[in-house]
C-alpha cells in the first residue's frame, strides 16, 4: 500500500488529500494502520488530514488515536467565514456555533487540540463581518488556534470564471506562491498565486 511505501522510505510527514477524512468507518481502519506503522518503524511521524464536518464520532475517534500517538496537531474545525452573505456567495454552510462550541468542549476535555481556519477576502465578507466572525469563534471556545488564509483564485474554478469575478467585483494580486512543507531550495520554476485583494 502507499502508506507502507511511505513508512519503508522513512517519510516523516503524510498530508492526506481526502477533504472529508472520517466520513467512512474505513478511515478509522486506515488510522489504525498508520498508528501501527509508526509504532513499528517510527514512520510516518505526522499524519495530517482535513476532516469531515458531519461525522463527529468517527472524527473524534480518529483524532484521539492520532493525538495519543503524537501524530497530529489536532482536529480541524474550519469555518471559512461566519458571514451568511460570504457563505452564500461561495456556496458553503457551517456547523452551528452551538454545535461547534460543544465539539470544542468535548475535544478540550479529551486534551485533543482543535484549530479553526478562516478565509480572508471571500466575496461578501466585510472587515466588520470578518472581525465579528473571529470574535464569535473565540467566544464559542476556540482558544487554541485560528489560522487565517488568503482567498486564492484557482484556474478552472467557479470563483475563477470571468462572470463570477465581474459579479463580485473581485480584484486580484499576482504574488509568488508560498510553499509550505517544502525545502528551502530555490525552485527553477517560479509559481504564482492569484490572491483576492478586494471584492
Predicted regions and their residues:
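Short, hinge-like loop/turn segments at secondary-structure boundaries
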Residues: 32-33, 133-134, 163-167
Amino acid at each position: 500500500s502507499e502508506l507502507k511505501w511511505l513508512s519503508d522510505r522513512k517519510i516523516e510527514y503524510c498530508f492526506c488529500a481526502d477533504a472529508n477524512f472520517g466520513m467512512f468507518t474505513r478511515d478509522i481502519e486506515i488510522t489504525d494502520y498508520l498508528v501501527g506503522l509508526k509504532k513499528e518503524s517510527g514512520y510516518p511521524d505526522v499524519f495530517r488530514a482535513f476532516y469531515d464536518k458531519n461525522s463527529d464520532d468517527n472524527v473524534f475517534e480518529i483524532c484521539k488515536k492520532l493525538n495519543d500517538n503524537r501524530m497530529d496537531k489536532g482536529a480541524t474545525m474550519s469555518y471559512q467565514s461566519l458571514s451568511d452573505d460570504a457563505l452564500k456567495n461561495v456556496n458553503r454552510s457551517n456547523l452551528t456555533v452551538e454545535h461547534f462550541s460543544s465539539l470544542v468542549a468535548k475535544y478540550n476535555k479529551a486534551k485533543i487540540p482543535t484549530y479553526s481556519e478562516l478565509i480572508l477576502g471571500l466575496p461578501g465578507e466585510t472587515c466588520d463581518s470578518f472581525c465579528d466572525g473571529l470574535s464569535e469563534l473565540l467566544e464559542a471556545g476556540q482558544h487554541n488556534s485560528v489560522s487565517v488564509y488568503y482567498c486564492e483564485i484557482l484556474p478552472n474554478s467557479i470563483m475563477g470564471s470571468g462572470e463570477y469575478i465581474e459579479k463580485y467585483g473581485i480584484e486580484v494580486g499576482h504574488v509568488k506562491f508560498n510553499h509550505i512543507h517544502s525545502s528551502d531550495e530555490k525552485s527553477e520554476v517560479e509559481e504564482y498565486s492569484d490572491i483576492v485583494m478586494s471584492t
